[in-house]
Amino acid sequence: MDKLVIEGGYPLSGEVVVSGAKNAALPILCAGLLSAQPVHLENVPDLQDVRTMLKLLGQMGVQIESGDGRVSLNASKVDNLVAPYEMVKTMRASILVLGPLVARFGHARVSLPGGCAIGARPVDQHIKGLQAMGAEITIEHGFIEARAKRLKGTRIVTDMITVTGTENLLMAAVLAEGETVIENAAREPEVGDLAHLLVEMGAKIEGIGTDRLVIQGVDKLHGAKHTVIPDRIEAGTFLCAVAAAGGDVTLRKVRPLILEAVTEKLREAGVTVEEGDDWMRVRMNKRPNAVTFRTSEYPAFPTDMQAQFMALNTIATGTSQVVETIFENRFMHVQELNRLGANITIDGNTALVTGVEQLSGAKVMATDLRASASLVIAALRADGETLIDRIYHLDRGYDRMETKLTALGAKVRRVSGSQA
């Protein structure tokens, strides 16, 4: 099992190109199931989760060509409507094949999801929405089985804001008969990117980027060509890395407008951030100020940046509160940050972080995707060497992170389990 070895204390400088968004690429790949014509995608990140999704689609009979950030999908010969446990257990986003399969083929059998160990994240909103559209759904032997001759448009009000739920129901609705209205829809940019692809494929969707999506169902979708939006979480992670380690770094192929909640907090921390249409420059040469924040749905501060910003707060001057409102059990990185010398206590869904002047390198273990990124950020600032175990979590969501950091001057190397 690979590990990362990081020697702290080196400021970062140079340029980094931000990859395509994982959380846009995964639903967009699933959208390829909705048409018998080819869908050509660009700026697809090379991540473990993307490779897993392509493997799943391949098992279903989708013909795939991929390489150099490009993926072409041809779902004209899909012959297997099952997403098995072996695939779904490693990646929750596999649930996103449910809506497209039921909408186009009238049947789907999807294992109940796994993925990051950060709370329940139930799929009941997906199921309720599809049932409202006329699907017959049973759950037995660990599988969700859905059947429908043709889904019927309806009004769906989700009990909670759910990103994957919105995406699944949106993909189902584009081929349903009549009008579907999704109220309390997730507004995340990644949902918007999926919607834009669907429109390019011939779907009729109004309200993109709002919490009310109105979809007029069509009989079939055609092929399309689409470029995946930049990954705002990868961009935010690099911004926090520079803020912690110090330095002067320019991010390319980024969308500053969808990062405003993060950059606002970075400026509050004393970081200098400049931005243009598709670039950001971040500079830092001092200890950050402690910043209190609360996670919430877009456009508020993203839960997927909570761990990285907490790592920054560990070395800040002052005390901060971090309130996690989206997922329970999303403070698993706290114990590991404390091993590096951080001073963090937890009370329910709130973490109290008292900044320390210096962290010290140690052996730590990644527990989930964003937690692993927080340990990398802390290690860049720590005194001495840090060994991060279980970095397969990092590989699920970051495209060559150690390569990009090394190019910026960080001392990072990947070692196999036998070398560590």
Swiss-Prot record:
Keywords: Cell cycle, Cell division, Cell shape, Cell wall biogenesis/degradation, Cytoplasm, Peptidoglycan synthesis, Pyruvate, Transferase
Pathway given in the UniProt record: Cell wall biogenesis; peptidoglycan biosynthesis
Any one Gene Ontology molecular-function term assigned to this protein's record: UDP-N-acetylglucosamine 1-carboxyvinyltransferase activity
Superkingdom to which the source organism belongs: Bacteria
EC number(s) on file: 2.5.1.7
Active site residues of this protein: C116 (proton donor)
Record PTM 2-(S-cysteinyl)pyruvic acid O-phosphothioketal, positions in chain: C116
Assigned GO CC terms: cytoplasm
Compartment annotation: Cytoplasm
KW Protease (keyword) present: no
Keyword ATP-binding: no
TM region positions: none
Residue numbers binding UDP-N-acetyl-alpha-D-glucosamine: R92, R121, P122, V123, D124, Q125, D304, I326
PANTHER family: UDP-N-ACETYLGLUCOSAMINE 1-CARBOXYVINYLTRANSFERASE
Function: Cell wall formation. Adds enolpyruvyl to UDP-N-acetylglucosamine.
Entry protein name: UDP-N-acetylglucosamine 1-carboxyvinyltransferase
Organism, scientific name: Paraburkholderia xenovorans (strain LB400)
